[in-house]
């Protein structure tokens, strides 16, 4: 009885030991015929790479780039952009308040101020680097050229340009307090937006346009009419500083108005209650974005590269990649050799390969 009991105990332990394996990786393999067996192998082929200079790329984007950055290997990289300003369909300026009809809102039929605001949210490089930005008015309509080798000189006269303004700036504006920078509206959205602002002549870009809209309302019928007859766009570039490139989200042309504070129930201006100003009509000032760069209008970026990339591309010891426009790496694969060797094989997986500073002649096994 003891021997039988001991034998049963050993058998149970053995079954328990071999029965605890939960690996199902080979489950069912034994049921397959021998001809269905899968064998894995790797092979290698010689790959030749070379650098190709790319002077431009197609860039259909609503982001503008402005600034300059110098790299010790690739040399300098300079970015600027040109953009039209969108005019909403059947645009109309605010009207002067009519006390008889109780319509309109402005205190006078004038524009109190005009400014061009370049908004950005991110940048590349040194946030405290001193830079200077210039804005020029375009004198010729932009073509639908989305390539980064666009020549701005075709659209404004470099010898006799219309300069809208110059402003010194740093990407991170240290004059803005933390309270301003972190302020939010009633919905929790931040109200501060980094920007570079150019003050424009209110007569040329404000009151003249206001008068023109009354004489030729068809000029403000849509963006096409506005660009053809009123304002063709702006060219934004950096002409001082090295080490910072701004990623511009949009460009706004804003106008300042003085208006009456109207009681919405009666459509009559509120009366002031301050001592010395009793019973005077209550007024205020506001800035409004009237025209802006949007996806509906043309925006084109120009990227300029140092001549250093020509020397790097000619080097035969390495290949390089410099984007978005600069140097591409071209890899020549031995297609015929691959086809002949793998014609009867099934490729279940191909491991992707990335190239960075490769030697001109390498095999996949070296990567």
Predicted regions and their residues:
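Bacterial N-terminal signal peptides that target proteins for export
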Residues: 1-7
